[in-house]
């Protein structure tokens, strides 16, 4: 079975990209367990707790990330360099994501057959 990586690289609420990626991820998890989730660049903001999307008239989908355990999604990584660049090293995110340096993150991403970017 092909391994599928979902890469979140955009900030939430500025576009529908993050919400659509999350919907695609959850739907795909019903078909396969060979999934990996990566948060890089501004995508690290997807996992911040306490967001207030209603202030910009956006849907609050961030809490849906907490369903990863229910959907057996446990391969989750976050870019350590992206966290440092944004001053987010000591934040408790809404999911447990393993921080990886860019070289290790690229190596891990190389283990996947299909890469979907949101």
Curated annotation (Swiss-Prot):
Keywords: Cytoplasm, tRNA processing. Coiled coil: none annotated. It is found in: Cytoplasm. It comes from the Bacteria. One of its GO terms (biological process) is tRNA processing. It holds the Pfam family DsrE. Belongs to the DsrF/TusC family. Heterohexamer, formed by a dimer of trimers. The hexameric TusBCD complex contains 2 copies each of TusB, TusC and TusD. The TusBCD complex interacts with TusE. Part of a sulfur-relay system required for 2-thiolation of 5-methylaminomethyl-2-thiouridine (mnm(5)s(2)U) at tRNA wobble positions. This is Protein TusC. It comes from Salmonella paratyphi A (strain AKU_12601). The lineage of its organism: Bacteria, Pseudomonadati, Pseudomonadota, Gammaproteobacteria, Enterobacterales.
């Amino acid at each position: 079975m092909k391994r599928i990586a979902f890469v979140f690289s955009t900030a939430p609420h500025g576009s529908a990209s993050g919400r659509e990626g999350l919907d695609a991820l959850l739907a795909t998890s019903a078909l396969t367990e060979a999934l990996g989730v990566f948060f890089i660049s501004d995508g690290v903001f997807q996992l911040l707790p306490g967001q207030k999307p209603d202030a910009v008239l956006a849907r609050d989908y961030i809490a849906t990330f907490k369903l990863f355990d229910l959907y057996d999604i446990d391969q989750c990584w976050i870019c350590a360099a992206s966290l440092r660049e944004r001053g987010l090293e000591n934040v408790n995110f809404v999911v447990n994501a393993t921080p990886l340096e860019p070289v290790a993150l690229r190596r891990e991403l190389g283990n996947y057959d299909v890469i979907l970017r949101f």
